A protein has these predicted regions:
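Active-site/acyl-donor-binding loops of N-acyltransferases
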Residues: 1-9, 14, 67, 135-161, ...
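A conserved beta-strand-loop-helix scaffold within acyl/acetyltransferase catalytic domains
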Residues: 6-56, 60-74, 121-126, 131-149, ...
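Glycine-rich, N-terminal phosphate-binding loop and its surrounding beta-alpha-beta segment
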Residues: 59, 63, 75-123, 127
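Aromatic (often tryptophan-rich) hydrophobic motifs at membrane interfaces
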Residues: 79, 96-107, 218-335
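Short amphipathic alpha-helical interaction patches enriched in hydrophobic/aromatic residues
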Residues: 88, 205-209, 296
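Conserved beta-strand-loop-alpha-helix junction that forms the acyl-donor binding cleft
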Residues: 119-129, 294-303
Length: 354
């Protein structure tokens, strides 16, 4: 265990839900996966933990961990998804704060609780190389031999006309086609809209014959528990034949995240998905959101979606790769427990695909 540097301190499980959301919105890198609602729905209230790091009494970093333990032995994992959060909204981010918060996380979950700690920080391959050094110096190694997933991030600080001009020619043409049709946009955060979207989403999944990457019903439950200012944005597009497309986006910090998209069978020719994305960008611009994360690309396994997102991002879109997951552990029992649990989960997943 390494003490935090002078002036820094940490607190664990000392905040309630309302205070957590107040702190969450102070960080530019705040996101859906660090919301209380997400952790509670995914793991249950007893299986989430909240850590604060302070400098001279002022909160400068936070992290929500999801805790999974093996029965009887008490060993297991603490997982920080898209965290910790350490980039303030109104000030310049300091890499030293990142160092202190991952040290505090390791002290609590590895040294005190004997768990395997795995973090998935919002760091990309084009960020400063200092972060890899900090992770290594603080006792973290890359989780397995995995390479981080890719995504495209749009800079929304540019004028709207520049963003439109940056769209690739194919995307611009499809958007113009959609704008000439009599399409109606319905938007909000209500459960009724979520229900309509799910019906369309399930229809698309059945048509394309692919396995859902995320449990959308779980996200509906999360939506019901999120406070108003953190709820997901739902946008639906209606043509003369009914609902033709929809999307769900999350905006908690300075980056909007595209979570789900769907197109109905009857809406295949409406180009509604193009219109929705553009209307969403207009809405994000009005809210002064700085970035739009198109949330995952894979040219090999999903070339169609990759092309859609690449053309939307245009020439100015950042095609980036996450640094990946990093972990630290001092307990052989926790390492073994997590390894067995993940193997069983992988086997179960393979059986479901057959």
């Amino acid at each position: 265990m390494r003490k935090l540097d002078g002036g820094y301190s940490s607190e664990v499980d000392a905040v309630e839900e309302k205070e957590w959301y107040r702190l969450l919105h102070q960080f530019d890198d705040a996101n859906m996966y660090q919301t209380w609602a997400y952790g509670q729905v995914r793991n249950g209230r007893r299986n989430i933990s909240h850590l604060l790091v302070k400098e001279q009494g002022r909160v400068i970093a936070i992290a929500q961990s999801r805790i999974v333990k093996a029965p009887l032995v008490g060993a297991g994992i603490a997982y920080v998804m898209w965290g910790p959060l350490w980039r303030p909204r109104e000030a310049r981010a300091d890499a030293e704060v990142f160092r202190q918060v991952i040290r505090a996380l390791r002290n609590e979950y590895v040294c005190r609780r004997g768990l395997l700690l795995r973090i998935y920080p919002i760091l990309f391959d084009d960020d400063s190389p200092c972060f890899l050094s900090i992770l290594a110096e603080e006792g973290f190694t890359r989780a397995g031999d995995e390479h981080g997933s890719r995504t495209i991030i749009m800079d929304l600080n540019r004028p709207l006309d520049e963003l439109r001009q940056a769209l690739r020619p194919h995307w611009q043409r499809e958007l113009k086609v959609a704008e000439k049709q009599k399409l109606e946009i319905v938007e909000g955060s209500e459960d009724e809209l979520f229900e309509i979207f799910i019906d369309m989403y399930r229809e698309m999944v059945a048509r394309k014959k692919f396995r859902e990457p995320n449990d959308i019903d779980e996200f509906r439950t999360i939506q019901q528990r999120l406070p108003v200012e953190s709820k997901m944005k739902i946008m639906l597009c209606r043509s003369s034949e009914g609902m033709c497309s929809g999307l769900i986006c999350s905006v908690v910090g300075g980056t909007a995240i595209y979570l789900f998209g769907a197109t109905s069978t009857t809406g295949m020719k409406s180009r509604g998905s193009y219109l929705l994305q553009w209307k969403l960008i207009e809405w994000l611009k009005c809210g002064r959101v700085a970035r739009y994360d198109l949330n995952g690309i894979n040219p090999e396994t999903n070339p169609g979606t990759y092309k859609f997102k690449r053309d939307l991002g245009g020439d100015k879109g950042r095609d980036v790769r996450f640094l990946g997951r990093f972990e630290s552990c001092e307990s052989i029992v926790s390492v073994a427990s997590v390894s067995v649990g993940e193997r069983l989960k992988s086997i179960a997943g393979s059986m479901m695909k057959k």
